[in-house]
């Protein structure tokens, strides 16, 4: 679902922008600090209700303003949506879809599936399991309508159980939580396992295209020993969990691991190879969504040239163009975009950014 128009007011140093966007490639060129990454951040915020750079909203609002406002028009065939979000310094958030209040961030996220590729995105590979669970859960959110409610209820029950561990004296007092928790844990873990298995050949095939010199393997770990009863594990671990003050084993510990030639990728790959593998994972997941759901996936790529050699840049650009996705790419100079053939397509848009102002 491409964005055809984007309006930004008081988002970081972007005080007032109204942009008509290409459904194909949108290139944003400017020096560091000019505001090009802030443009990607604003698009990401529209689709997630949060930033990929800061968890503190007041740092995102322009220093002379009391709020920021983002508005976009989404086009898909004969359908069109108008979406908007306002964030105030007080913390209040107003979200509208087609002029109507009462929507949730998850409603916006369903309308705007997007993948973001940034220099900080290597945490997907060298960070903790949290980042890789988020990777899996993004795909599940867009793949299965029932996943979000199961996942949200699971998080709620885990939070309640952890709080109860500080209060209960015997396991009998905790058991009602565990009955429901075990059911949801099994459901969510089965969804994760099925999705991981379906995505695995897509990842391996895409890795072969970009990294033929490496044998990349992927594996899903549900967070407790496979083939065992999670309800029994909760019961047996009660005293340990109570002593620690939280639930130590379960779906909140799940992981999606990547190995290169049999070894953990973070131990054997160079930083450039890790960057390329991260791009491959995002691309494979976005392409899988398009194939399964026949929906477009937006790609936000910050600092395109960073740590990718010209050949790999050209391969990535080729695959993105083949996918038919809407892509937003930032670069410091136009020369860094040469592998994207930006001069050759009249349907692409190129924006120059300087001190928060954009010109075509």
Curated annotation (Swiss-Prot):
Location(s) in or outside the cell: Cytoplasm
Binding site for ATP: 30-37
Lineage: superkingdom: Bacteria
Pfam family, one: SMC_N
Major location category of this protein: cytoplasm
Keywords: ATP-binding, Cytoplasm, DNA damage, DNA repair, DNA replication, DNA-binding, Nucleotide-binding, SOS response
GO terms for MF: ATP binding; single-stranded DNA binding
Entries under InterPro entries matching the protein: DNA-binding_RecF, DNA-binding_RecF_CS, P-loop_NTPase, RecF/RecN/SMC_N, RecF_2
GO cellular component: cytoplasm
BP terms from Gene Ontology: DNA replication; DNA synthesis involved in DNA repair; double-strand break repair; SOS response
UniProt xrefs under NCBIfam families: recf (TIGR00611)
Protein's job: The RecF protein is involved in DNA metabolism; it is required for DNA replication and normal SOS inducibility. RecF binds preferentially to single-stranded, linear DNA. It also seems to bind ATP.
Family the UniProt entry places it in: Belongs to the RecF family.
Protein name: DNA replication and repair protein RecF
């Amino acid at each position: 679902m491409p964005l055809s128009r984007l309006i930004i007011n008081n988002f970081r140093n972007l005080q007032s922008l109204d942009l008509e966007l290409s459904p194909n490639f949108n290139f944003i060129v400017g020096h560091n600090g000019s505001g090009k990454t802030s443009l990607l951040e604003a698009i990401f915020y529209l689709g997630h209700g949060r930033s990929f750079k800061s968890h503190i909203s007041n740092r995102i609002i322009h220093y002379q303003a009391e709020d920021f406002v983002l508005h976009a028009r989404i086009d898909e065939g004969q359908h069109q949506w108008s979406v908007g979000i306002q964030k105030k310094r007080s913390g209040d958030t107003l979200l509208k879809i087609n002029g109507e209040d009462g929507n949730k961030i998850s409603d916006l996220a369903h309308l705007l599936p997007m993948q973001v590729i940034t220099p900080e995105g290597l945490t997907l590979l060298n960070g903790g399991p949290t980042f890789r669970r988020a990777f899996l859960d993004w795909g599940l959110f867009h793949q299965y309508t029932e996943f979000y409610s199961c996942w949200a209820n699971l998080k709620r029950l885990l939070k309640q159980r952890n709080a109860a561990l500080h209060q209960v004296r015997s396991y009998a007092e905790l058991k009602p939580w565990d009955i429901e928790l075990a059911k949801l844990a099994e459901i969510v873990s089965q969804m994760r396992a099925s999705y991981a298995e379906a995505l695995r050949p897509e990842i391996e095939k895409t890795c072969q295209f970009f990294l033929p010199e490496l044998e990349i393997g992927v594996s899903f770990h549900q967070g407790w020993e496979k083939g065992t009863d999670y309800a029994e594990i909760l019961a047996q671990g009660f005293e340990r969990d109570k002593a620690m003050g939280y639930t130590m084993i379960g779906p909140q510990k799940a992981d999606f691991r990547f190995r290169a030639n049999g070894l953990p990728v973070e131990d054997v790959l160079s930083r450039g190879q890790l960057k390329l593998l991260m791009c491959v994972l995002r691309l494979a997941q976005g392409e899988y969504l398009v194939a399964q759901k026949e929906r477009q996936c937006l790609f936000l790529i910050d600092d395109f040239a960073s740590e990718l050699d010209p050949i790999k840049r050209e391969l990535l650009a080729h695959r993105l163009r083949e996918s038919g996705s809407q892509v937003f790419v930032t670069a410091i100079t136009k020369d860094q975009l040469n592998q994207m053939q930006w001069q050759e397509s009249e349907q692409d848009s190129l924006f120059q950014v300087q001190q928060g102002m954009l010109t075509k």
